[in-house]
From Swiss-Prot:
Residues in the signal sequence: none
Biological processes, Gene Ontology terms: Mo-molybdopterin cofactor biosynthetic process
Family stated for the protein in its record: Belongs to the MoaC family.
This enzyme's EC code(s): 4.6.1.17
Classification of source organism: Bacteria, Pseudomonadati, Pseudomonadota, Betaproteobacteria, Burkholderiales
Cited InterPro entries: MoaC, MoaC_bact/euk, MoaC_sf, MoCo_biosynth_MoaA/MoaC, Mopterin_CF_biosynth-C_dom
Gene that this polypeptide is encoded by: moaC
EC main group: lyase
Function comment: Catalyzes the conversion of (8S)-3',8-cyclo-7,8-dihydroguanosine 5'-triphosphate to cyclic pyranopterin monophosphate (cPMP).
Keywords: Lyase, Molybdenum cofactor biosynthesis
Protein name: Cyclic pyranopterin monophosphate synthase
Length: 162
């Protein structure tokens, strides 16, 4: 199991010891997309969904998702997040919505999982609020786009289109 930090020498799962790591500013940016029917897109764009402000509710859900990541992903460390920012971009061409989450902390481990969870929960909330009119929505292309801080340094996805 070499290279996989969440397994010990015997192959058993464990939470990685970060006690000896330096505390640094950690930032991660994740992005994902939900594709939908044009009529569903219009409901969101025009603020006419029966359940209310889809993107407003999805933003709050995404922030809550980032905060609850350690409760959902068994080997994630609970982190004191210093910032969670979530933005939605309407894309007429898809049609669909892009979700971008930036998560920050000052600590010993990165916040990539928190950023990914924020995006997923935000997009799942869009699905939940619109599924009555469009069960065929597709959540896609969820990925970490950038991370900063820590021993491994900064990283940015080569495909900067997303």
């Amino acid at each position: 199991m070499s290279g996989l930090t969440h397994f010990d020498a015997a192959g058993h799962a464990h939470m990685v010891d970060v006690g000896g790591k330096q505390e640094t500013q950690r930032i991660a940016i994740a992005r994902g997309t939900i594709r939908m029917l044009p009529a569903t897109f219009a409901l969101i764009r025009d603020g006419k969904a029966k359940k209310g402000d889809v993107l407003g509710v999805a933003r709050i859900a995404a922030i809550q998702g980032a905060k609850r990541t350690a409760d959902l992903i068994p080997l994630c460390h609970p982190l004191a997040l210093t910032r969670v920012a979530v933005d939605f971009e309407l894309d007429d061409a898809l049609p669909g919505v892009h979700c971008v989450a930036q998560v920050e902390t000052f600590g010993r481990t990165g916040v990539e999982m928190e950023a990914l969870t924020a995006v997923q929960v935000g997009l799942l909330t869009v699905y939940d609020m619109c599924k009555a009119v469009d069960r065929g929505m597709v959540i896609t292309e969820v990925s970490v786009r950038e991370k900063r801080g820590g021993k491994s340094g900064d990283w940015k996805a080569e495909d900067t289109a997303g």
